[in-house]
Amino acid sequence: VDREDLEQLVDLSVVCTVSSVDTGLALNAVAENRSTVAEAHIQVDTGLGFGGFLISEPEKILLAYRSLPNVALSGIYTQLHAVTGKSQEVDGQLGQFQQVLEAIHQAGFETGTVHAAGSFALMHFDDARLDAVRAGSAILGRCRRTKGDGLTTVGYGEASITEVRWLPKGHTVGADKLIAMKKPTRVAVLPVGYQNGFGVERPRSQSLLELWRAWRRSRNRTVRLNGQRVRVIGSIGASETILNV
C-alpha cells in the first residue's frame, strides 16, 4: 500500500477499503500519525478473487475489528459474481457472506452498512440488495444484461455534422479495418466516437451466438439524420464516425 495515497485518502475523509490485516494496519498507522480516525469498510472475497479477506479466515477479519483503534469500520461488503442471472449462482455466495457476518456479530462487533450487489446483481437478485448497492456500470449504461430484464431506452444523443464531402471510388475509410469505396460516395463526418460511448456495448452473455449477434449489429450500425436512417461506414473512431449520406 502506497503511504502517500493513504495519507491523501485520509486527508480527504474518503471511506477506504480494508482488504487484509496489512492494509488495515497501514491505514491505522496513517490515521494515528495524523491524530484522526479513518473510516473504512471490510472487503470479503466470496469467490470473485479481486481482493478481500477469505471467508475461510474469519479470525483475520475479527483481528481487524480488534486491532485498529484509529479506523472506524462502518461497513462490510463482498462482490457477487454471476453469469446467467439464475439465483442459485449467488445463493451460495450470500450464504457464505452471511456466515462471516454472524461470526462478527457473535464476537460482539457491529458490521455497519452491509452490501454485496454490483449492477448485475442489483438488477437480477432481490436477496442481494442488502443495506446498500454499488451501481457502477448500470449508471454508465454499459451493464451486462439478460433477456427480459425490463430495461427500456430513456434517451438519445445528438450531434451536428462537421463535414460533408464526396470520396472517389477506391478511397478508404475506417479506423481499424480500412474499407474501400466501391463507387463515388457522399460521406458525412459525425464528431462522435467510441470515447463518447458510441458503439460500445456489452453482449448479454459470452456465448458464441451472442458474440456473433454483436458482431452482426456492429456491421449494420445506423444513425438518424434529418429523420432518415443512414449507415455507418467502417469502424467507429475514437472521436469521429463516417456516415454514408
PLM features per residue range, with description:
Residues S20-D22, G92-V245:
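Active-site anion/phosphate-binding pocket segments in diverse small-molecule metabolic enzymes
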